[in-house]
């Protein structure tokens, strides 16, 4: 993923029994995320403060020969403090954070160890 500024993980802990990971993020500057999935895991995003402009992408084609997933824009919405959103396995989304933001993300597994899809936006 490409970001204009990286997130600062203020907390990341993996539960040894379930494998779930809890991550607390602080974005003090603009942060723009590329369309991505969470591989074979799901994720729950909880907005603690600020706003995130989130875009959902529709999978148009999965090309197994070059391992590329083509997507097109589906919808864009604003996540405000108190909003929570579940992203199931394979769901493609991208966040834009223009102002300071704090958020909590719960992952079904530690994403540091999971391969993510190679996603390409088509128009």
Model-assigned labels for residue ranges:
Residues 96-123:
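Double-stranded beta-helix
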Residues 44, 59-90:
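Short acidic-glycine-tyrosine-enriched beta hairpin
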Residues 1-7, 11:
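Single conserved hydrophobic/aromatic residue that forms the stacking wall/gate
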């Amino acid at each position: 993923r490409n970001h204009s500024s990286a997130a600062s993980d203020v907390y990341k802990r993996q539960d040894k029994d379930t494998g779930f990971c809890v991550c607390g993020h602080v974005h003090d500057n603009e942060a723009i995320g590329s369309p991505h999935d969470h591989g074979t895991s799901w994720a729950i995003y909880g907005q603690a403060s600020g706003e995130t402009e989130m875009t959902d992408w529709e999978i148009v084609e999965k090309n197994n020969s070059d391992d590329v997933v083509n997507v097109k824009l589906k919808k864009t919405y604003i996540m405000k403090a108190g909003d929570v959103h579940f992203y199931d396995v394979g769901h493609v989304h991208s966040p834009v954070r223009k102002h300071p933001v704090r958020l909590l993300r719960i992952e079904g597994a530690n994403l540091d160890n999971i391969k993510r899809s190679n996603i390409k936006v088509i128009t």
